[in-house]
Swiss-Prot record:
Regions crossing the membrane: none
GO-annotated cellular components: cytosolic small ribosomal subunit
Complex formation: Part of the 30S ribosomal subunit.
Name assigned to this protein: Small ribosomal subunit protein uS17
MF terms (GO), sorted A to Z: rRNA binding; structural constituent of ribosome
Keywords: Ribonucleoprotein, Ribosomal protein, RNA-binding, rRNA-binding
């Protein structure tokens, strides 16, 4: 495990207890056609205090495995998001 590996993304879902889903946009280049395309990587992140909400921009840090798919934890909330009711 790499030390101090951090990423910045936005919260997609906060419906689980102590867990949030974070989306991180990644730009990749096709190896043959050289076209750049975007993908959103989704990570399960441990949020001990349930403080992050949908739309927040957050920083996550890699940690020991907490469950089968959860090995990132919330480091800090950079900006609070706002939810627009439809």
């Amino acid at each position: 495990m790499e030390k101090n590996k951090t990423r910045i993304g936005h919260v997609i879902s906060d419906r689980m207890e102590k867990t949030i889903v974070v989306g991180i946009d990644v730009a990749k280049r096709h190896p043959l056609y050289k076209k750049t395309y975007r993908r959103t990587m989704k990570y399960l992140v441990h949020d001990e205090k349930n403080e992050a909400k949908i739309g927040d921009m957050i920083e996550i840090v890699k940690c020991r495995p907490i469950s089968k798919g959860k090995y990132w934890r919330l480091n800090r909330i950079i900006t609070k998001g706002h939810i627009v009711a439809a």
